[in-house]
Amino acid sequence: MGSTPAGCAILIGKFLCRFVVRSRNMGSIIIPEGYTSRQNIMETEIAIKLIKDFFERELSKELNLTRISAPLFVKKTTGLNDNLNGVERPVAFEMKEAEGEVIEIVHSLAKWKRLALKRYGVNSGEGIYTDMNAIRRDEDLDNTHSIYVDQWDWERVIDREDRNIDFLKEIVNKIYSVFKKTEEMLAQKYENYTKFLPEKVTFITSQELENLYPEISSGERENRFAKEHGAIFIMQIGKMLESKERHDGRAPDYDDWELNGDLIMWNPVLDSALELSSMGIRVDSESLERQLKELNLEERKELEYHRMLLNNELPLTIGGGIGQSRICMFLLQRAHIGEVQASLWSDEIIAECEKNGINLL
C-alpha cells in the first residue's frame, strides 16, 4: 500500500492539530469542532487491516507470544469469565445439550488464558495471545466505548522473581515500543501523516497521582497527567487509596492490585485521555486470598478456577488486553470508535454522527 492522494491522507499536522480542539457535548458523544473523517469507508478498512496485521506481528515478537484459538463463551460455574467491576451483566444462555447449565459470553479472557497456559504446557518467558471478541451489554456508549469489544488478550508465564514493579515496567516499555513502530510504519505509508507519540512512557502509581491532584476525580487526574506527558502508565489500579477511594474498580481474581496498571495516551482529537491497554502481574494464592477478603467475595474460592489458584496449580503469569479498535481509532485519529468497528449505536448517536461528518461502519 503506497502513499495516498492528499485528499484522503491521514492528516494530523495539517488538519487536526492546527486548531485547538474545542468540543461540544452531544449527549453521549463529543463532536470535535471542524472534524471530518479523512478517509472514505473502504480506505479506512484498508488502514485498519494494515494496523492490526503490523501491530499483532510486532507484539508477538516483542513478548514472545504464540497465537492460539479462544472461546467466545464459557460456563458460569467455572468462574472463568471476567467480572470486570463486579456489576456488569454478561450475556448468558443455555444450550440444548446442557439444560440448566448457564453459559456466558466472555467479557474478556483474563482468567481463561492462565488456565490455557497450564493446559498447553507453556514455558517461563513464553506466552500466548488471542483475538478476543466480547459483548459488554452494560457499557455506556460514547466516543470510545461500544458494546462490542475486540482486543488482543495476551498472557505470559513468569518466574516468582519476576513478580515486581521493575519487571512490569519492562513489559510495558516493550508494548509501547510496538506503538512507536506502528506509528513509524504509518508515517512511511501515508503522505502527510505526522507522528505524535512521545519517546517514552511516564510511570506513576495511583496514590502518587492522587497526591499530585487531590482535589479532582480519578478521571480528571488521568486527563491532567496524560495531557502533560502524552503516554502514561498508572500503576496499582484497584487498591484502596489514602482517601479511602479506589482509582478505578478492578476484579480481585486476576490482577495483583500492587503490580498492575493502565496504559493511557493523550488523544488530541477528543482532547482527552484514552486507555489503550489494561494489564498486570496476576494474583498468586496470597494476593488472591487478600483481595477476595477485601471485597467480601470469599465465596468465589469455591469456584474451580479459584480453587486451582489457591492450591498453586496454575503458573505465575503476567497478561493483559490491548484494544484493537481503540488502537486503530487512536492512530488514525478518528473521533468515534464506530469509525473503525461495526457495532450497534443509538438512533441519536447515529444521527449526530451523520450530521457531523463521522462515518460509522
Put a short name on every predicted segment:
Residues 2, 19-23:
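Short, positively charged low-complexity motifs
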Residues 46, 50, 54, 163-170, ...:
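Generic recognition of stable, solvent-exposed alpha-helical segments in well-folded globular domains
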Residues 59-66, 175-186, 335:
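A generic secondary-structure signal for well-formed alpha-helical elements
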Residues 27-145, 153-157:
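Class II aminoacyl-tRNA synthetase-like tRNA-binding/catalytic domains
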